[in-house]
Amino acid sequence: MVESSQSIVQDAIDVAIGERGEIGVQVAAYLDSELVIDQWGGLSDETTGQEVDGDTLFPVFSNIKAMTATALHIQAERGLVDYYQPVAKYWPEFGKYGKDKGTVFDALTHRIGVPLMPVGVTPELMCDWDWMVGQIAEMHPLFEPGTRSGYMAYTFGWVVGEIVRRTDPMHRPFGQFIQEEICQPLGITDLWAGIPPEVEPRVAKLTNLPECPSRRSGNTSGLAAVPGLSAGGGDYPGGVWPF
């Protein structure tokens, strides 16, 4: 049964690459803690011809939100964060332009009012934590925090992550907190919030197909400068998902 499943998955990968426009694919599945599917195909880097293998690391969008929220829950469990206190209690600079009453709960539930990326953001600036959180703190909210939802497709990590960093008695960088408090205790070896130099050669490079432009519309607010990323939200002004 396992062998037939592996064959089915590999066939699907081959079709995705050969007929559906995928460049590189990797699939792993576990059953009762045992790795039963471990298939891959295609390229991890079109420019060099490097192939995908079992050690290739893929950027997986939004999975880090779960780790970020878990990090905050750890702080709450330790009594370092109260979900119903304002974010500005822990991060005073955030409490500007009407964001002072937005709570940690609002941040966790995408109701804090800052769903868009900073204007002028670049891939390099996205890697500058202090720049990102400084720019987010200076933002005017798109709506009064707590009154509606605006999905934080990208800003969630910096908003919630900065609360974690500010409440960490050791003030560790957020990526270090994730490694030391979540990944290492659980034996997770290949999940990163910020890629170390020695790991970077294993990371697959994302590419947009030129014949498949993003279907999303709206104000990209700086994300257009980031290769492979799009920040629209249906037809809603400013790319906000009004859930």
Predicted regions and their residues:
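Short, well-structured active-site flanking segments
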Residues: 36, 67, 73-92, 167-195
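Hydrophobic (often cysteine-bearing) scaffold residues that line and stabilize catalytic clefts
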Residues: 5, 9, 60, 64, ...
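Short, surface-exposed loop or secondary-structure junction motifs
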Residues: 45, 97-243
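Short, conserved catalytic-motif segment at the N-terminal edge
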Residues: 2-60, 82-85
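Short secondary-structure junction motifs
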Residues: 22-24, 78, 82-84, 136, ...
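Non-cleavable N-terminal signal-anchor transmembrane helices
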Residues: 30, 34, 41, 59, ...
